[in-house]
Structures are given as C-alpha cells and as structure tokens.
C-alpha cells in the first residue's frame, strides 16, 4: 500500500452548495486520481472491524461504504421545483477543491464550514488534519507546519481529484473547469465524475427511472460521487500523530509519549471531542498514522453496506428529500477492466440493486429502532465470535446509528425483525423466487430475504403494531438519549475492546434442528442477565454460526458481490447538533444496568463479567446450566466433566454443578454472601451489617474493648489471669451451645435471610456455609494469625495476605483501599512493638476493624482478631514481618534468631492451603496441591450452602 497523504481542502464557495455525502473507500495508488471520498465511520464500527481482524487473525477483506447524513448549520435552503421524475430530487453539490500534504497520515476529506456569497468565487483552503479553514494558502502552509509536517505540499481538487504541485495551476483548473458547470449542475440536480482513467473533470446528469423511492446503486467500474441535501459528514479528525522518531504526539495539547498504551491513557482527556475517536491499533509494529489506510482491501472484492431511508418523508430543516448514489471503486492494479455482469435485484418493498461478482457474505444489523430493539455490544461481539475464522474473506459489519441528544423517544425508526424460519416453511405467498439464467430476482412481499435456508425479515411501518403484540415492547429501563461524559466514553471504549478480545471463542454448538425453536420469538424466554429483545438478537447471532460453516448456508449468496438492504422507516427528524460521543448507546446501557445493580460500585471486572456472561448465555440459561448441553462428559479422561462455557474440568460431577454457578448472575441487590435479595441499596446495606463484625466487647476489668470475643478472652486470660469459663461469663452476649472438641459449629437460623447460618463455637463468627466456619475454626488452633474473611485463607505473613486479597478485587462489596490500609497498619504496628508485651500488641492492632457504613466490612481484613496466640507466637510473627518488603528495618534471620529467647519461634514465608492446611515454601507446589480442592474452593468463594449443592445433584 502506498503512503497516503494528509489533505488540506481548496474549495470554491458557491451559493447553491448545500451538502455532500462522502464514503470511505480504497486509497488510490496514485495521487493523480483519487477515486473515492472517505467519511468517518461509526467509532463502534471501527472498533469492531479492528477487533474482528485480531480475533480472526487475518487481514481485512472489506472496505465499508457507509452513507451518512448530517445537517449543515449554516447552509441556506433553496426551494427547487421538483421535476417530473420517478426518483426523489436531490440538491446540487459543488464539491470543494483540496490541498494535499505528504505525511504518514491517512487521507481524509473535509467539507467546508462556511459558504461564500451567492455571486463570485472564493478559494478556501482547509487542513485535513484538523478543522482549520483559511482563504489564504500561505496561512494554511504555516498552519500545516504546526503539525510537524515539513514535506512538500501537494494540491488536490476534491471535485475530480486532480493533483498538482502548483497553486496557480490548480486554481486555474478550479475556475475554468468548475465555474461554468455550477449552474448546469444546479438545474440538473445530479452529477457524477467520469472513469478514473480520465484526467479531466467531466460531469453528466444521471437519472434512475426504475426506482420510485430512494435509489441506491452500486457500480464496480466507475468512481463515485454521493449527493444529498445535507452537508457532508466530517471526515476523521487525526488528533494524534506518529512522529518519525518513534513518538506519539497529541495534536490537541502537544502531549508526547513513546508507547501506545500511554496514548490510550491520555485519550481520557479528549474523549468528549466531536471528532476524537479512541485510538485502536491494528498491531504493535504498524505506525499509528496508517490507521485509516488499513481498511484498504487486498486483491478481492469490495463489500458495501448502504442504509437507505424508506418511502416515508425525511425532514431535514425543511429541506428536500435525499437521493443517494454510491459506486464502489475497482481495483486499479488490474490492467484490463472487468466485464459487466448481470445485476440481481432484491425488492424488500423498496428498491435494492446488487452486483454479483463477490463471494463474501454481508450481515447488516441496524440499531436505529432503539426503543423497540435496544442495540447491544453483546450482539456485535457474538457475531465476531461466531464467524468462522477459516472462511477467507468473510465479513461481519455492524452498522449503528448514533441518536442525537435532541431526538425524541417517540420517533418511528426502521425496525429489524428477527423472526427466523426454515426456508422450506416459506409459503409461496410470502416470497416469489424467479430464476432466469444468471439473473436471479427475489421478490419478498413480506420483507424477507432467503439466506441459506434462513429467512430474515425487516418489518415495515405496517408491521410494527403486530410486532408489539408479539412481545417486543418498549423497554422502560432503556436510558434516555443523552451525551456521555468523557470518562464514560473512554471507559466503555476500553471495555468494548477488552471484552471482544477476551471473549471465549468457543460458542454454543447449535444444529440446524435448533433453528425452528429459535425462530419463534415467543419461545425465547428472558434471561436473567439480558432483556428479551437482546436474547432474540443473540439467538440470531448464534443461528448464523452453523450456517456459515455449512455447505448450503451460502448458496443463495455465492454469486453476490455486495448486499444492499433498504430498510423502511417512518418520518425521522434530524437535529442540528452532532452527538459528542465515541460509541453506541448500547454500552452505556450495560454500564447503567450495572450501576443500578451495584449502587455505583461497579468495577471494570463487573462489566466485563456482564459482557461475557451475556455472550455465553442461552435462552433460559438457569435451567440449561444443569443440562447436558453445558456439561460435556469425556470418557476415559482424568477429568471427564468439562464446562462448555469455559475451560474448567473436574472429576466430580458435584463440583461441576457448583462451578456452573459462576456463569449464573446475581439478582439486583442480592447479597454476595447469602441468597438474600434486598429491595434497594439501603436495604442491602442494612442487611450487610448482619454479616459484619461490628460488635464491641468491653472488658469488665479495664477500659479496653475489642471487636472479637476471642480477643477479649485472650486479653482477660493474659492480662487479668482469668480462666476461660470466667471470660465466657463476663462477655456481653449469651452463648449458644458449643462443641469445642472437634471445632464443630452450631447451626442457627438467620432472621434476615432464609439461609441457614453456622456459628463458630469459639467466637461469634457466622457463615452461611459449613466449610466457611470450618476454615475459620482453624484460626483458633493454628499459628497463622492472618486470614481472609472472604474465603478463609490463613497465613502468617501480612504481605502474603495482601497478595491474596487481589483475588477478590472483583467482588462487588470489596473495598481494596480499606483492606490494604488495614494490612499496612498491622504491619507497621507489629513492626514498632518489637520487644513490647504481646498484650499491647493486641491492643494496638485492634484498630483494624471493618467499616459498617460502607457495607464491606465482611471483606475487610482485621488482623487484630487473629493475633490471639501465645506470646512466643505473636512475637515470632512480628519478627517475621521485619523481613517483609514493606518494613523499613532490615534484620537478618541470624540477628532475629540471636535476639529471640530460646523458647521463641520465628516464622518464615509459607504458602498455606486454605482447605486442609498444607504448607509449602514454594508457590508452585501449593498451586499443584490446590488442584485437589477445586470444587471446595468454588464453593467457598461463592459462599453457597454445601447441602444445597448436594441437592442439585
């Protein structure tokens, strides 16, 4: 691919100039002739296209041509008499001339922001790197130098893409060739450039008399111009540059960095800019400046996606209706022109024209019917996942329209109906298929298209009421159209990219026999993690997966060059403003659902978990989790039971049942420790206090108080020489029967939940699982004074506990800052009390309590409750902490051994198994050992009742 050039526009201003619609295409290998104009695609489309290349590990085979509309704020409307033509007339477009600059930047065209007066010609120069517009060429040259570009300037006329290095020569070309043609084009209301082999700019008037509605045509042999009544879509604004010396530079604030990840982080500051898109890099060794040019296709066809407005009236500031003509460019490297083939017409109550020269299949999903079918990144991700990586040239294109903030929710838009039936069930009245030689004409009276035995329908405005009766009701939880904040935009960009890359490639295996079930919308039950309409779209994505691999799945499209679909819609108002947003509203819907669920405590891991669960889910997933279609049995294997949703394997069927709970989401405001479901966030916070250690135990002999009864008992025994029986008698809480011999626990009922509660017989620790209390009980019988309150992990080294707590960072009510502070305080305090009495050590460390207000005190690690061992054990632990990296002192083992009395023990860093107490100085040995307890670990983390798990068998 040849090095592209940045563009500065040289534009002749004309009064009748109304609008222009540009399209993104293949960059010409010669600067003499540029065949197509490029427009900025939807950022979400850009993200998905880039990530689909990563997932499929192949080069891009597509070049999307996406027609967009955008009203011009300063364009004056002119009422022109409609000619007696079949098509809807369009305004004349006088395309501007341009100034081009050589650099390592992709070529981008911009339309003028200002219009000259009706009389006379004014040359304007516009920089392609930003929006800067000037009537002086010298001023623009100085401006371009500010971008760090020092190469020579190349001028280009954007009307016919003729290039020249002489300013006078190109200005004369614009005046002579385009001045007299303006009036002719105004009267004819249409224009088109000639073949790319011509160096002159000629214009012809073209009419499409066969199409009564909006004509959309694709021609493989000619370059194109696109006409519309609205002003052209602004091209991609290159807000970052890749310097020759290997540095990335932000053009907004001149920020420079040497790594791509630093530039992505810096993009937070500019996420709200209109033309600022989140940087997505194709690969690490590709220069950043070649981002746009990466869309150029290898030898192969060009896939075009065109969304046309239906027969309903389109209102753009009282302007005329729209005519769109798009022609895809040919491969300029071919020496001989391609032969014109017969065209295939597909009529979906609108006119659609196709060219049959390509083998790629195009899938189009429109989300403009946002209120009836909320769009979803999950559907986009699933379409990328379900696409066959072995099919060369297969293209997945997701088309989304960003609604303006001023658009009302009651507007009628085009709706994509996902009713799917087997091709054999299609009645003759629904579709009439005629085949004559190489010309295949499909007439679908019911707005259906036959794609490899699969019927996909797009409903017109008459079918909307019928669809509403079938259950596609407006979602009340859908957020209103609003502009996202900078942090939301960039955070969602990151999550979209991360989720699509990390999504599991293995999709649910569906057969052709399953298509009949998914075809009926009424049979699709709502999933706990997804709305019903999203489940319908997800089912459509999964249905397409087996069809792509089947031999008969693409028979109806094997000869199709590109697929153009006209989607009817109702009247649509287009506002003046442009949405300052980076991606679609669907991602905002996902994050707002999680925000409502977790009361603004959702983390990135929660959102990624939401995306992955929704992508993995199937209709009625709660019941299917226990079915054989999710658990795969592999005979003669060491671990015969395998989860289809992930890579988990187990030799015990009960353990795999427990593991499946990982893929089941919690209900809104459900307690993460037990099964209690609160009504709101305040109710959940009040409930969480029952799981927290918030009670204060006052010593009857002195002024000291403790958060745990075991601390009080040890304090009274060591400081006041009281026996254990007296300690129990002086406590503030009556005891329930205990069994101290084996450390067994007492079962009791919890008023706040229907779950059974297990209580420790030594202290008042309670848990909903027997295993949790059993692991807790080891604290009173071991010399490991630090424990994890989430899973029962115990250790004698505070840094080990700090490292362990990262495993629970995704917990909804986990407060890492609070836990980390408590551990650091325990380390610093225990380091300062070397040589002091163990009693004072316990008193000072008792400050590490949980915060009952935040509702996360169950997750907070309190080291004081565990420092209740003998004096030798406590002092030994303190000496071990002297060796920790977080301690300021640097005593060696020899010094500690010499300072310690003969009866004192000192600890070394050990890795402890939280299930059976196995210890090892090697972390690898512990990980190998922990494989034996996979099922129990899952049970502990999920805090589920062991008896309930056995009942599910």
Curated annotation (Swiss-Prot):
Entry keywords, A to Z: DNA-binding, Metal-binding, Nucleus, Phosphoprotein, Repeat, Transcription, Transcription regulation, Zinc, Zinc-finger
Top-level taxon of origin: Eukaryota
Pfam families noted in UniProt: zf-C2H2
Biased composition range(s): Polar residues: 854-891
Regions crossing the membrane: none
Region of interest (Disordered), residue spans: 470-489, 831-891
Location relative to the cell: Nucleus
GO molecular function term, any single one: DNA binding
ZnF region ranges: C2H2-type: 125-147, 155-185, 248-270, 641-663, 669-691, 697-720, 758-780, 786-808, 911-933
PROSITE patterns on file: ZINC_FINGER_C2H2_1, ZINC_FINGER_C2H2_2
Any one of the GO CC terms: nucleus
Segments forming a coiled coil: none
InterPro entries listed in its UniProt record: Zinc_finger/UBP_domain, Znf_C2H2_sf, Znf_C2H2_type
UniProt record, GO biological process: positive regulation of transcription by RNA polymerase II
Family assignment from sequence similarity: Belongs to the krueppel C2H2-type zinc-finger protein family.
Function: May be involved in transcriptional regulation.
Name of this chain's protein: Zinc finger protein 507
Gene that encodes it: ZNF507
